[in-house]
Amino acid sequence: MDNTMMNYRKLTAAEIDILKAQRCDASDWSQIEVSDAFSPEYVHYVRFSGRVRIGAFRKEFGLAGGIRKHSGIRYATLHNVTVGDDCCIENVKNYIANYEIGRDSFIENVDIILTDGVSSFGNGVEVSVLSETGGREVMIFDRLTAQTAYVMALYRHRPE
């Protein structure tokens, strides 16, 4: 389900108590909203500020070497962030700000993730490919594949 289509609710007093016991803190607990299936069980050592929305954590991630990690948020600061269902966010040295993190995302051992103001995340930007001198620009868009970029760069002047 898309994060924008989820139904959110305020945290209950019991959930806030559990989060506090798990060393979580918020500048304003009333700004934190969670999905109906949310459980605070997998949220530890997290600081919240601004408007934060959190999905449910039901899934485990299988990592190299046979390690399994349950989705959840641990050791992070979130500001104006929406976290989709079944994400694993761990060990964020500084913070994540002004982001919508899609479902099943895995973010670990990062310094800072933020966006300020309006951002296209590269959509519509032309980049030079195959030659540092230019002339083979490809416009980036969110569904661009390597195969499409190849055709755009090498066959751009052929009408068919």
Regions found by a protein language model. Name each.
Residues 1-160:
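Terminal amphipathic alpha-helical/low-complexity segments used for targeting or macromolecular assembly
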